[in-house]
């Protein structure tokens, strides 16, 4: 990994492969790193952002790594995409500080994430209207957003793949299996399913709203998350992680 980043903290598989919707044409690989001391000082002195984000393509792999400070700031917003990266179970590289980042991510799971899931699903549903509900991959992404949000708001569990959503009462095996079949066989969605899916999306939207209103999660990332983020940032820029 040092080909791509000076000091990696962790590297994981993210995106569609993590969701259980693999795309044979590309694989999303994400990670976090710290800068070497000279570059860290330079960025502080000149308020620059050199190597804040490292983006490389190699083969079909899209590799993106975020400087630790940026990664932690995104977690604390909170940003569901970054929580998902931090908690990915498809780990390619893990330093001894990876668990610290995961601990911070867990403490950023809160009700505010509702706005991410709602904001992700609604625009995609409008896109589906334009596409006449023909693209199974887009429909699966919408389902995943609703399922992830409902599960998290109800139980506090932040999961990413479809197999983790089967515990939900609202999970529809028939629709999910059919859409996966359409995606694998590269065929459009049958008219008989389109009306059913559209109605199902409406039901899931209502369930997401109800889960938000009734959720026992904290409203914002915890103070513990903020304190631990500061402690980790200080530690990693004054301690050699190469050991």
From Swiss-Prot:
The record's listing under InterPro entries reads: RlaP
Stored PANTHER family: NUCLEOTIDYLTRANSFERASE
Q: Which protein, by its recorded name, is this?
A: Uncharacterized protein MJ0002
């Amino acid at each position: 990994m040092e080909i791509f980043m000076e000091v990696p903290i962790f590297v994981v598989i993210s995106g569609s492969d993590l969701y259980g919707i693999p795309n044979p044409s590309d694989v999303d690989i994400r990670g976090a790193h710290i800068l070497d001391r000279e570059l860290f000082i330079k960025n502080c002195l000149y308020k620059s952002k050199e190597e804040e984000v490292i983006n490389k393509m190699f083969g079909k792999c899209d590799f993106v790594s975020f400087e630790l400070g940026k990664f932690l700031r995104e977690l604390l917003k909170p940003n569901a995409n970054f929580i998902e990266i931090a908690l990915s179970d498809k780990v390619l590289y893990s330093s001894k500080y990876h668990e610290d980042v995961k601990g911070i991510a867990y403490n950023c799971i809160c009700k505010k994430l509702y706005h991410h899931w709602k904001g992700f699903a609604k625009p995609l549903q409008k896109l589906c209207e334009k596409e006449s509900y023909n693209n199974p991959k887009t429909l699966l992404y919408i389902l995943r957003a609703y399922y992830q949000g409902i599960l998290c708001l109800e139980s506090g569990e932040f999961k990413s793949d479809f197999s983790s959503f089967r515990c939900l009462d609202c999970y529809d095996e028939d629709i999910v299996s059919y859409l996966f079949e359409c995606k694998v066989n590269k065929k459009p969605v049958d008219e008989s399913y389109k009306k059913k899916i559209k109605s199902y999306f409406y039901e899931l939207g209502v369930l997401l709203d109800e889960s938000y209103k009734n959720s026992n999660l904290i409203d914002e990332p915890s103070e513990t998350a903020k304190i631990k983020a500061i402690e980790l940032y200080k530690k990693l820029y004054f301690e050699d992680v190469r050991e």
